[in-house]
Amino acid sequence: MFGIGAGVSFFVNYSHKNLPVQSSPAISTPVPAGTEYASVRELAEQMSRPGGFTSEGLVTYLQERIRTLDPQLRSVIELNPQALETARALDQERANGQVRGPLHGIPILLKDTIETQGMQTSAGAFALVGAPAGKNAPLVDYLISQGAIVLAKTNMTELAGFRGTPDGWSSRGGQTRNPHHPDADVGGSSSGSAAAVAAGLAPLAVGAETNGSIIVPAALNGVVGLKPSVGLLDRDGIIPASQHQDTPGPMARSVFDVALMLNAMSARKSHDSASVEVDYTKLLVPDALKGKRIGYPVTFTANGEVQALENSAQFSKTLEVLEAQGAVLVPINLRIADASGYEKLLLSDVKEELNGYLAKRTGLPVKSLTELIKFNEDRDGKDTDHQPDLKKINDSTLDPASRETAWNELIQDFRSTVDEPIKTHTLDAIVSDFDTNSYFGVAVAGYPGITVPSGTTEDGLPTAAHFFGTRLSEPTLLAVAHGYEQAAQAATKPEL
C-alpha cells in the first residue's frame, strides 16, 4: 500500500483485508439485507422517512459488501476515503430540510479514467499512478452538486483496451470477473462499473465508451447501460482516446435510474456539450411503447450483398414483448458501412490525444506514449509482447489533416446506416439483439444506444436487447427501453 497525497491511500495489490476501516457514529436504523438491489427512488424514500436509514449507513453497508465480495470480483480498484464524511454532511443537509435532488446521499462508482480529486485516475495502469488528480472532472462536480457520493473508482480493461490485454484486466486492478459466472466474459472496457452494479456493490456507476465500452459490459453483466450521443456530456477531465467517439455514460440496474443519472450528468453545459435542458425521466410513463414505430433488422447489406438475419429465440421474445405493449414493429434492412479504414483512424486519434493528455497531467511517472511503453517494458519485461496495441498506436504516422477528412467521410457513412431506415420508415428507434454487434456502427456514428436485460441463456448468463437511434434521440430511446424493461421484467440477479 502506497500513501499518495495528503491522507489518500491506494492499493497496488488491492488486498481488501488492508482497506481502511473508517470510524462512524452509531447508526440508529440498520440497513436491511437486500438493500443492495434497491432502486434510487427506494433508497431516497428510506433516507427521507422518519426512522429510515441514513446515507452514512448505506455507504457503510456497501463498503462492507465491497470488502466481502470484491476480492473475488475485482471490480473496485480504489475506495474513496472521504465517502463517509461526505455522507454525514449530506445526512445533515437532509435533516435541515435541504435536498439537492434525486441523487442526494446516493453512492456512485466512477470508471478509473474519470479524474476524481484526491484519488488516482490511472485507467488501470501503474504507469499512470502518481499524484492524485488535482480536481474533479466537471462531470464529477455535476454529480456531486446533485448530492451523489463517490463511493469508489472501478477497475477496467487497462488503458480502455488500447494496451491490448484481455477484457476486464488491468495491471493495477487484476482481472474483473462477471458476477453471474467467474469464467464468463465480463466485457470491456467499463468492466468494473458493470460488474459492481450487477453485484449490488453500488446502485449507480459511470462508464465511458469509445466503441462498445459501456454497451458490451452492461449487456454481458445484465445491467442497463446508456451510451449517449457524442458531445452530449462533458468529456473534460476524462482520459481520452478519440474526440470523434469518446463519451461518458450512466450504468444502473434500471432505465429510470439511468435517466436520473443522465439528468445529473448533463446538469450544466460546457463548450463540449450539445445538450439542451431536458428531463430524461419525463417520458418514462406507462404505455410508453404504445404507437412507437420500432424497426428491427431482418436483412443486412454488406459489400452490396443482402443477407438474411436469423433471430435468436431470445430476440424473438423481445419483439413479442414490444408488440404486446402496442409498439408497431417494422422489418428493415440494415446496411453495414465500410469500416476498412477505421482502425487506422482510431489509433491515430489515440496517439495524438493520449500524448496530449499525458503531457499536461502532472505528477505521473510518464509524460508520453513512448515513455508509457518503456515503463511497461521496464516493469513487466520484454520477453512477452504484453502491449501490442500501444506499440501500433505509437507507430501511427497518419497526418492530422488527412485524418480529419477521412473521419468526416467515415462518420457520415455510418450515420446514414442509421438515419436512412429511420427516415424511410418513420421510426422512433431501432432494436437489435445485442449479439449482432450493432453497437459498433452506432458508436462510430456518434449516436446513442442503450442496452437492457432481455433474459438469460441456457447457461444462465444475461442476454440483452440494444435500442438505438439518431443523434440526440435519448429521450425517446429511454422511453422505449423503459417500456420494454417494465413489460419484460427480464433482469436477473447473480448468485454470488
Question: What function would you assign to each model-found segment?
Answer:
Residues V31-N211, S229:
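Gly/Ser-rich catalytic/binding loops embedded in alpha/beta enzyme cores
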Residues K227-A313, Q489-E495:
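A short helix-breaking turn/cap at a secondary-structure junction
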Residues L43, A123-A125, R177-P182, S189, ...:
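Flexible glycine/proline-enriched surface loops and loop-helix/loop-strand junctions
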Residues M1-T86, K317-E320, A324-A327, K374, ...:
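An N-terminal boundary/leader segment
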Residues G105, S145, I149, A202, ...:
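Glycine-rich, small-residue loops and helix-cap segments
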Residues R253-V278, N303-A337, N355-F375:
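Acidic-enriched catalytic cores of C-N bond-cleaving enzymes acting on peptides and small amides
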Residues H104-A123, A288-T299, S348-D413, P453, ...:
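Short helix-loop capping/hinge segments that flank enzyme active sites or metal/cofactor-binding pockets
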Residues E45-G52, Q63-P71, P81-L84, R88-N96, ...:
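Sec-exported extracytoplasmic/periplasmic mature domains
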